[in-house]
């Protein structure tokens, strides 16, 4: 792994996603805690009619908030254009950013009425670094 802690980094792992860490699997919590104490920072609701300028502005505001905390690592996942805008800003400032990688396991049940019911389960496997 090419991530290295330096003297500027704090000791926190910021979870900037729609998935509160309280609901994570033990494997995901353990993996995050290798980088620092987990701090949840709620992912914003991005309106579908938001303009590119509005999304960029929101990314800038949250980049400033994140950078001020001097995180060791940031998990950033959610609406694509906002995620891209934020990740780009964080990497430009030397902040390491990751996405969670999960295996999707699907159970399919065929019901007596002919319908099909699918249950999806996501099993955390690792964090993958963004390299923009």
Give residue spans per PLM region:
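Long, low-complexity, Lys/Arg-enriched
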Residues: 1-71, 88, 92-132
